[in-house]
């Protein structure tokens, strides 16, 4: 995200605290992060798939249903989750953007050890089905599964919690 964050993460690897990283290939400091990762051959490098709250890798003309006029995804994960339930051309746009993010990481020469997703949207049923399809074309050998629940529910669920539950159920 930021050069200072990248430097701190690489310092963590250099001191033995961190063994792998997940990169957002469309983030503003992604190039320097990929260069730094490439200089550390033992570092596991994964793709942190961004389909919400960030900029797309592809130009807007290729994915008009996914991004606003500036090429940014919706900022709220719940809004993205509802959007990605739609079928038709939207699924193909998602697939194209996911493919573009994978290819951008692989074009650096880095070996992709895993995938994760911003706000865990890589686990959305539509996105996960696309990742399963692409696994035969790319070295997707591991997909991060969060240890805990994505949402925490209390006795009195808010309407946001109920909507979030409905998206993934």
Where would I find each of the regions flagged by the language model?
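Active-site mouth loops of central-metabolism enzymes
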Residues: 1-2, 83-95
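A short alpha/beta connector and helix-capping loop motif
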Residues: 3-27
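Acidic (Asp/Glu)-rich catalytic clusters
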Residues: 9-15, 31-44, 65-71, 106-107
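Structural preference for beta-strand elements that scaffold enzyme active sites
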Residues: 18-22, 42-48, 111-116, 141-142
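Active-site beta-loop-alpha junctions enriched in small/polar residues
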Residues: 24-28, 48-52, 118-120, 148-151
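Short amphipathic alpha-helices and their capping/turn segments at secondary-structure boundaries
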Residues: 32-43, 54, 58, 129-138
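Active-site gating loops and adjacent loop-to-helix segments of metal-dependent hydrolytic enzymes
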Residues: 56-88
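Catalytic domains of cell-wall/extracellular-matrix polysaccharide-remodeling enzymes
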Residues: 90, 99-169
């Amino acid at each position: 995200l930021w050069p200072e964050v990248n430097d701190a993460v690489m310092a963590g690897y250099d001191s033995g605290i961190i063994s792998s990283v997940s990169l957002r290939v469309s983030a503003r400091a992604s190039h320097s992060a990929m260069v730094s990762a490439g200089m550390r051959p033992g570092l596991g490098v994964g793709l942190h798939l961004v389909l919400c709250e960030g900029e797309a890798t592809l130009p807007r003309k290729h994915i008009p249903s996914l991004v606003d006029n500036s090429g940014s995804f919706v900022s709220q994960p719940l809004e993205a989750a509802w959007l990605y339930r739609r079928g038709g051309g939207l699924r193909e746009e998602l697939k194209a953007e996911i493919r573009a993010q994978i290819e951008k990481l692989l074009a650096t020469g880095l070996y992709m050890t895993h995938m994760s997703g911003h706000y865990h949207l890589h686990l959305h049923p539509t996105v996960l089905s696309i990742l399963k399809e692409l696994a035969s074309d790319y070295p997707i050998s591991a997909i991060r599964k969060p240890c805990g629940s994505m949402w925490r529910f209390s006795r009195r669920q808010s309407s946001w919690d109920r909507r979030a539950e409905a998206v993934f159920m």
